[in-house]
């Protein structure tokens, strides 16, 4: 009986202890996470102009948000980094941060949020002027034509009577 008592006591102590036994625990233990400073999340999107807001969300001030697209693929790397990050200028909604003009994102989704329109006006207007010069010439003409075609109503063709 004493031979089985020692292993049983050891297993009991092991079960009731609260240490980190898994590899995914933060350095310094469970309570060390509050001591870490938040870093800025990874850059993403076209030209690295955006920031990750979740594993499949990439937002940029002048581009808006990409959710579940190729532009947001880099954001999946954030899951493998040991330190927490935070993007966005100010808190909004339920646990989100302002991501772009009028858009509030958390790590799972984005919603329109009127309080996120403040602080983006000047940047959005300045970028409108700079983006217009980037599309001068044939590329700009092609893009303009595609937008016009997409917005044009389709021609109405009367239905042909069925012939037997």
Swiss-Prot record:
Glycans are attached at residue 131. It comes from the Eukaryota. Disulfide bonds join 20-25, 41-85, 44-58, 52-75, 59-65, 92-104, 98-116, 105-110. The keyword Oxidoreductase does not apply. GO terms for molecular function: neurohypophyseal hormone activity; neuropeptide hormone activity; protein kinase activity; signaling receptor binding; V1A vasopressin receptor binding; V1B vasopressin receptor binding. It is linked to Diabetes insipidus, neurohypophyseal: A disease characterized by persistent thirst, polydipsia and polyuria. Affected individuals are apparently normal at birth, but characteristically develop symptoms of vasopressin deficiency during childhood. InterPro entries: Neurhyp_horm, Neurhyp_horm_dom_sf, Neurohypophysial_hormone_CS. This is Vasopressin-neurophysin 2-copeptin. Its main location: secreted. It is found in: Secreted. Keywords: Amidation, Cleavage on pair of basic residues, Diabetes insipidus, Disease variant, Disulfide bond, Glycoprotein, Hormone, Host-virus interaction, Secreted, Signal, Vasoactive, Vasoconstrictor. Interacts with vasopressin receptors V1bR/AVPR1B (Ki=85 pM), V1aR/AVPR1A (Ki=0.6 nM) and V2R/AVPR2 (Ki=4.9 nM). Interacts with oxytocin receptor (OXTR) (Ki=110 nM). Belongs to the vasopressin/oxytocin family. The gene is AVP.
């Amino acid at each position: 009986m004493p031979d089985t008592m020692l292993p049983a006591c050891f297993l009991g102590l092991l079960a009731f202890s609260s240490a980190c036994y898994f590899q995914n625990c933060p350095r310094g233990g469970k309570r060390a996470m509050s001591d870490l400073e938040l870093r800025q999340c990874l850059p993403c999107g076209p030209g690295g102009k955006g920031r990750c807001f979740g594993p499949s969300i990439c937002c940029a001030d002048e581009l808006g948000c990409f959710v579940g697209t190729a532009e947001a693929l880099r954001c999946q790397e954030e899951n493998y980094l040991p330190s927490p990050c935070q993007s966005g200028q100010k808190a909004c909604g339920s646990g989100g941060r302002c991501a772009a003009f009028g858009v509030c994102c958390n790590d799972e989704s984005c919603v329109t949020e009127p309080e996120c329109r403040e602080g983006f006006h000047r940047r959005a207007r300045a970028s409108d002027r700079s983006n217009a010069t980037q599309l001068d010439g044939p590329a700009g003409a092609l893009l303009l034509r595609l937008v016009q075609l997409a917005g044009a109503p389709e021609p109405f063709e009367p239905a042909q009577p069925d012939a037997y």
